[in-house]
Amino acid sequence: MAVEEKNSPTGAAMTNTGILVPSSQQSLPEWWTKTQKFFSRENTITPTFGYFRLLFGTQPGKTDIALIVIGTIAGIGAGIPFPLLGILFGELVDDLNSSTCSTTQAPPGGYQAAITTKVLQVIYVSILNFVCMYIHTGCWSMVGERLVRRLRTKYFHSLLRQEIAFTDTLPSGDVTSRLVSDIEVIQAGTSEKVGLFIGTISYFVAAYIVAFLKVATIAAMLMSVVPIYFLMAFGGGHYIKKYSGRISTHINAATSIVSSSLSHMSIVHAFNANARLEALFAQHLVSARMDALKKAITHSIQFGMLYFVAYASNALAFWQGSRMIADLAEGKPSKVSVGAVYTVIFVLLDASFVLSQMAPFMHIFASAASAGDRLMTTIKRQSAIDGTSSEGDSTISLASEEIELQDVTFNYPARPEVPVLQGVSFKIPPNKHTAIVGTSGSGKSTVVALLERLYDPITGCVRVGNRDLKEINVRHLRGSIGLVQQEPNLLDRSILENIAHGLVSSSQEKHKHLLPTLLGPSLSELTEKIRQGASEDEAVTEQGDVVREIVNLTRHAATLSNAIDFINALPDGLATRVGSSGAELSGGQKQRIALARALIRDPPVLLLDEATAALDSTSERLIQAALNKVSENVTTVSIAHRLATAKDADNIIVMQKGRVMEQGTHMDLVARDGVYAGMVRLQNIGKFSSSSSIMTESTQVDANIDRSLTTDTLLNKEEKLSLEQGVLDEKEKPAQLYMPEEADSLPTEPENEKEKPKQTLWATMKGSFPLIRPNILLISLGLITSIMIGVSYTGEAVIFGHTVGSLSVCRGGPSIRSSGMLFGLLFFILAIVKFAAVIVNGAAFGWAAEKTLYRTRVLSLRSLLRQPLEWHNADGRTPGLLVALVTSDASALSSLTGTTIGVLFSTVANLFAGVILSHVIAWRIAVVLLATLPVLLASGVLRLRVMAQYQKKHQKAYAKATAITVESVDNIKSIAAFSLEQEAYSVFNRSLKAPYKSNMKSVLHGNFWLSLAYSISTLVYALAYWWGSQQILAGMYTQVQFFIVLPALLFSTQSCGQMFALVPDISKARIAASNIVDLLSIKHEGDEEYDKTGSKASAKHTDPRFNMLEDKPRDVEAQLITTTPPSFPTKGMGVQFRNVHFRYPSRPNQPALDDLSINISPGQFCALVGPSGSGKSTTFALLEKFYNPASGSIIIDGVDITKQSGAAFRDTIALVPQENVMFEGTVAFNIGLGARPDVEATQEEIEEACRLANIHDTIAALPDGYNTVCSQDGKQFSGGQRQRLSIARALVRKPRLLLLDESTSALDVESEKHVQDALAKVARKTTIVAIAHRLNTIHRADRIFMIEGGRCVDQGTHAELVERCESYRANVIHQSLDA
């Protein structure tokens, strides 16, 4: 049952369908509802309607309506005063003409009084303009802030509602791109710039109204060009949207590479894969560059045409006006005065100028509409399986119902051509244990997904009792099932919250009253207090009885899952944060937490997909015994590769290639001597000399387990020892093994890094210059054309002043006509010159920006991939935040070589040219007006400071919300399985509250200075006319001089006002540049080559950070380069650990290795076994030099790697991690990543490695074969298939040392046998070290090291350890199918 959100941050309520509806929606007027429906139509495709659909198609509430209406009215009001100024100025021109042409000496006092009156009127207009501008910029800024918050929440909620098939086909990096890039574009296009644009349109319309009232003939002529403006705007918007879509596709693919690389830095380092990943990343960026250039050229043509039409139309107005004034001078009948013509030309010239300044805004609005459409596509999508819906039967109980699959066929949407299930039919009896076994990729996990209704069958059906699964409410169904997945996924919350997630949708009536607390902030606040030092009991008491009940249930579930002791051993206990996807916990710990999450809801149906695969055999046996007790009256479905965990099932279903081969009990299937019996023979661990002894031992162990289940703990003696020493469960520790979890684990980074001095502006500029330097010619061309554009305004002022002077009736008609023709022609020539300059400017800066963006992104990724793991796991350095460095920050920095810097330089050129010309023409007027410039600049600088502080303060705030969204999509199966949509949504909304409130305060503060910067120019108008008229009346200057100086300076001040609209972009670029310079300034080993004396050995490369940057990177996927491989050594490595002590930096009081000493001879196959947390995986971390030991030596081939700089020794080491990682790219690319850094794997070598890993046939059967694209993490492949791909990636390296961390845990017995045979082939030239809990995989090892408590307690062959090592023998017994 969905729960209503009483106080949603968006002012919305969640209906029983899970759809957000504004709380005020029902009271909205009918016209508004119809407007929303109109602009929500999917067939409304023009950019204009797309923009209105963005504003009105997201269910705005009353507040939003009020803000839009008030902001629009204020924007219209802000545009009206300026045409009124034109009327006043026209009357003033008539007065000045009358005084200069009069044959009698008129007293100056009359003219001075009229001027003073008009100046006061200008001041009143200025104040009105400031008020209107502040209102509309404030309102529209709030509209934009509220809109993007609604879009964030709606987009996130829509993602949560979608069926898993949708997220399976979602491009990797798409969510990050939508919530970072698209949201930023939308906010830029729906904030204060909208009010400014409305004001400009209002100005434009009002100007034409005034023009028609004054001189209708000229106004009508100029009115004909208005449709051209709209044609250019919409035509350009269409192409800009087209190219933006293409760019977005390429950038999303590139972002996926960044995201997956930064999320799996251990693999990147282990295989030195950074160069190959960088090349693939660059390849996607190059694909985007041509479309970006086309977009820039389209924009510059659109912008240039606006200038051309504006200036050409003014040329027409000058010419036609001169003819009318000439008629008046010749005494012909005419109602036109010089002032009236001046008013028309002045207001239309200024209106055209200001409208042309809005061209960049139109580009921003078009981009915002395009981004909004991309988001709305997902927001409006109807989910095929909606886990938040109230539809379906919510009364059926699964406790006593039979579950049946009837002739089910199924294909995954990501690979529709590959059949997964083919006519599968079987029954799952109630309250019985059904086990499903079979080869990897046979469809076992798919069956679980169908039972959870994460997918629907293509044909056939799944039934519960006599009801089709589709008839049952999805939330109710999933609430009745406890699921433990093959790869357990946890959310970035505390252990307490993760286990309590199992209660959120529990079908048990006794848990219903807990739901409001589970969805609220109580548990988060509780764990935060505990982490801050409060005792658990005190914090729980403060939160109340419901929270205490949840904590007690959590502890009980943790006890059942054998997790309570390791939780208690953690410093923060249940309050310990698990990190992104549980990265702060080991695999075994995550699996136990996931098991507790399933058991806490006391479900009638339990689905276990390899639920104990990551555990050592003793822990597995303990948990299995516990499961047997709690599942006595539970329908249990388990998937297992370890047949020892399935042999006691009431029914075993054997699957192969998507079909059911046979089913029955263990004894029946063994007797049948079919597929299952063959699997049993493959998995049994050898024969023992004394079977009776083994049976006796087995009986004793079972008795010990039964006794342990009656006590408070389920841990065995070895695990207690490990936990008392604080050793992490790092057998399956990708987080600790390959990534440390705390910020204080930074040996390469000083503790006071957070207090390091802020980059000065000069340091930032100096550090950014190497990024810009290669494009200096393009930038120079852009700067030259920017100066031309800026100076053209001064040229316009010169033409304008002479034109106004030539229209005086004191001159004869022929002279007026010839002057009008001349200056009209000059204006037309100016239009052509400016058109060409704008196009060249846009193309030059656009190309320079794209090349700088490419260079910055590639170098940023290069630097990130070269950082040590400790750096990546420092406080606040999540993959999501680091992705922003490569995407958002690089994009912001590139704007400094694009349109932003172009506008800035043209404005500065305009300012200097206007000031210089004014001083040359009429310095007395200019020097007074120039005194106002510092006031204008000061208002802009103050706003710059406000926006810079705002940007820096909240840079991480919304990144947290983005990280929550990305994490939720990455773990969408867990969220769907446990119906955590509402919980995730609540956490997401809470993360938005703080930045939203602070943003609103910044809006009110920052827009004050923006409004002042815009409005102050009208005060300059007032001062200019007052002082200029005094100078004319005093005979110091002529009208021509005045009307040159006036527009020259006023255009300059107006340009400054426009420049301050770019302050947010400049502020972002400043912060982004500082971030990127900081990143690129980090030194790496190998940046400089030194000889033995410490001096530089070579001065050839002045700064290696900027070397080897290919402008046209090779196609790393399509071209498998055949190279002559170097002569690799033909024998394995020798490895020695001598008295090694090690503690993880984040837990300095807890030893991980305690005087470990082992010796592995070259070419040996050795194994590390022992209980979870004994230090096995830590040895791999030290062998890969992810860490350095506190003391002792690690010697590889006679070289102590702890005393050597660099990590070149990794070139001949290959790692198969427990959690198998795939990157965005083809299968061939993923396998080729394993090749040594100086060699590209050929297709033949890749196929050979795949054959050895028993995955070649599977790949070859795919429609695209080795060119099949892997999504991020390879989710279209099964767990076993991914594991075999990882093995192939390791084998293609031809390693001398092969490290296998549970490398066959997800494999069926047949695949496991193939892999074991392959390893036997390569073992002749390779040293193999394996960590394993499945002892049948290592019982033939040359030497087995028994690791307990961080030290080696015994070593020998399998037979030797069975005879003399009690703990090893116990493990053998637990895994024996004969026991």
UniProtKB/Swiss-Prot annotation:
Residues 738-758 are annotated as: Disordered. This is ABC multidrug transporter MDR2. Pleiotropic ABC efflux transporter that may be involved in the modulation susceptibility to a wide range of unrelated cytotoxic compounds. CDD domains: ABC_6TM_Pgp_ABCB1_D1_like (cd18577), ABC_6TM_Pgp_ABCB1_D2_like (cd18578). Gene3D superfamilies: ABC transporter type 1, transmembrane domain, P-loop containing nucleotide triphosphate hydrolases. The gene is MDR4. Belongs to the ABC transporter superfamily. ABCB family. Multidrug resistance exporter (TC 3.A.1.201) subfamily. Glycans are attached at N97, N552, N633, N989. InterPro entries: AAA+_ATPase, ABC1_TM_dom, ABC1_TM_sf, ABC_transporter-like_ATP-bd, ABC_transporter-like_CS, P-loop_NTPase, Type_1_exporter. The chain crosses the membrane at residues 65-85, 119-139, 193-213, 215-235, 301-321, 336-356, 781-801, 820-840, 901-921, 922-942, 1008-1028, 1032-1052. It is a multi-pass membrane protein. The lineage of its organism: Eukaryota, Fungi, Dikarya, Ascomycota, Pezizomycotina.
